[in-house]
Each structure stands twice: as C-alpha cells, then as structure tokens.
Design a protein with these regions (language model features):
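DUTPase catalytic domain/fold
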Residues: 1-139
Length: 139
C-alpha cells in the first residue's frame, strides 16, 4: 500500500518505518518546539496525508519520548482529512521539554476501518459482563 504525503513545508520529513515490519511509521517535528511544563502543546509535522478509503491513521507515542514524561494525546485521522498532521502532547514534568527540529516525536499506524451503524437494543451477556478497570486483579 502506498500513501500519498504532501509536504506543506520544504523542510518537512515524510513518515518512515525504521524496519520493514514495524507497524508504526515515525513522525518528525517540523521545527524546534518547547513544551511548557504541565501543559498540553501541539507540535507540527509539516505534512498532510491522503489515506486510502476504509483506513484511519492512529497517532501513538514512542517509548523513547514517553519514558521522558511526554505523553502523546492519541489522535485519530479520518481518511478524508487533508490538513496538516499536528501531534498533541502533555508534558507531565515540572520543567519544559524541547523537541528538536527533525526529531522523531510519535508514530503513525494505519489501520482498516469499519463504519458500523449503531442501533438501540438488548445486548448479550458474557462471562466478563461489566468487569473493567482492574476487576480481574493484578496477579
């Protein structure tokens, strides 16, 4: 599958998978961006995509970034969207964090998408039922 990428800025980098079998393609910071402490910030990539029909783009964190206390606020890119890919982050730290120009900031995963219609009705019972939020214990 090929995905068309438009550079909105000359210095933008196209997404790159580090290894042929990696699920995610790295997204890069268009410019140096300082994330203030304990705040949400947006980081530009300088690219737009043309995702194939029946797919979506999911923006996920990179462990090399998130282990530094910088949390990607996961995003969903609909196939018809043609605007710039901008990644939102939350800096969990008490100090600012700087992304350098060209630094890997997040991962883009392209997934098949279903378009269900939601209808009201009774739902079947399962063994799990309503268990959630750690209901099975930690060990």
């Amino acid at each position: 599958m090929q995905i068309k990428v438009k550079k909105l800025e000359k210095e933008a980098k196209l997404p790159v998978r580090a290894h042929a079998t990696d699920s995610g393609a790295d997204l890069f910071a268009l410019q140096e961006t300082v994330l203030p402490a304990r705040q949400i910030s947006k980081v530009r990539t300088g690219i737009a995509l043309e995702l194939p029909e029946n797919t979506s783009g999911c923006v996920w964190g990179k462990s090399s970034v998130e282990t530094k206390g910088i949390k990607v606020m996961a995003g969903l890119i609909d196939a018809p969207y043609r605007g710039e890919i901008i990644v939102c982050f939350y800096n969990l730290n008490d100090t600012p964090f700087t992304f350098e120009k060209g630094q890997k900031i997040a991962q883009l995963v392209v997934l098949p998408t279903l378009y269900p219609t939601f209808v009201e009705g009774e739902i079947s019972q399962t063994e799990r039922a309503q268990g959630g939020f750690g209901s099975t214990g930690s060990k």
